[in-house]
UniProtKB/Swiss-Prot annotation:
Its main location: membrane. This is Receptor-transporting protein 1. Residues 260-263 are extracellular. GO terms for cellular component: cell surface; endoplasmic reticulum membrane; plasma membrane. The lineage of its organism: Eukaryota, Metazoa, Chordata, Craniata, Vertebrata. The gene is Rtp1. It comes from Mus musculus. It is a single-pass type III membrane protein. One of its GO terms (molecular function) is olfactory receptor binding. Interacts with olfactory receptors. Residues 1-238 are cytoplasmic.
């Protein structure tokens, strides 16, 4: 009796068509360092506006303006003062998926010091960054601001500087559009300032009423996933995922064409 051994069966050879090979050479730009991130287009505008306004207010004193991404909230050297702008308006641009978004909750930290004997002072600034909530990348992106917004923010900085460093009173802080209450929820898990413990946003009464109405007529959120994180997952329509699905589709078409030609 002959024993049937299925593993000894010979399958007909498949002759796959040969396609011409080609290679695409592309060079990706190097990732910018923290020093390059500080030298953005708006950095020159900040210095230009600050120097012009300080020349009008205190022409006898010399001041320098430095961008410092390592500045810490409430961590001050002796003699230094602090001013915190909580509601600046800025536009962010993701360096990975090219998604852009507007935020009226940009936090800017200033540290100020004046040497009255030398009649010289220094201002250090840090603009807190945000994460892109579309692609979910862990890369922090910096914001860009309009010139009129920078002017109002510098006016507020100089008002605080005159109060804390020169002991002058009677200044007025400019209330710009971004400092008004906003009805959109601020996603603290994507905000660098929120992650460092700076509380700068709370929902308006209108937003609280809308959330209460939504909670009444809809199912309660899962305890394992807070409502604030809704929509913060992976975006399958981003460019990396589109390239992945296009590769899978091309592979399927290639296999179908190969089997048809072999038959």
């Amino acid at each position: 009796m002959r024993i049937f051994r299925p593993w000894r069966l010979r399958c007909p050879a498949l002759h796959l068509p040969s396609f011409p090979t080609f290679s695409i050479k592309c060079s990706l730009p190097p990732l910018p360092t923290d020093e390059d991130m500080c030298k953005s287009v708006t950095t020159g505008e900040w210095k230009k506006v600050f120097y012009e306004k300080m020349e009008e207010v205190k022409p006898a004193d010399s001041w320098d303006f430095i961008i410092d991404p390592n500045l810490k909230h409430n961590v001050l050297a002796p003699g230094w003062k602090q001013y915190l702008e909580l509601h600046a308006s800025g536009r962010f641009h993701c360096s990975w998926c090219w998604h852009t978004w507007q935020s009226p909750h940009v936090v800017i930290l200033f540290h100020m010091y004046l040497d009255k004997a030398q009649r010289a002072g220094s201002v250090r600034m840090r603009v807190f960054k945000q994460l892109c909530y579309e692609c979910g990348t862990a890369r922090l992106d910096e914001s860009s601001m309009l010139e009129e917004n920078i002017e109002s923010l510098v006016d507020n900085l100089i008002t605080s500087l005159r109060e804390q460093c020169y002991g002058e009173r009677g200044g007025h802080y400019r209330i710009h559009v971004a400092s008004r209450q906003d009805n959109r929820r601020h996603r603290g898990e994507f905000c660098e300032a929120c992650q460092e413990g700076i509380v700068h946003w709370k929902p308006s009464e209108k937003l609280l009423e809308e959330e209460a109405t939504t909670y009444t007529f809809s199912r309660a959120p899962s305890p394992t996933k807070p409502q604030a994180e809704t929509g913060s997952g992976c975006n399958f329509c981003s460019i990396p995922w589109c390239l992945f699905w296009a590769t899978v589709l091309m592979l399927i078409i290639y296999l179908q064409f190969s089997f048809r030609t072999s038959v």
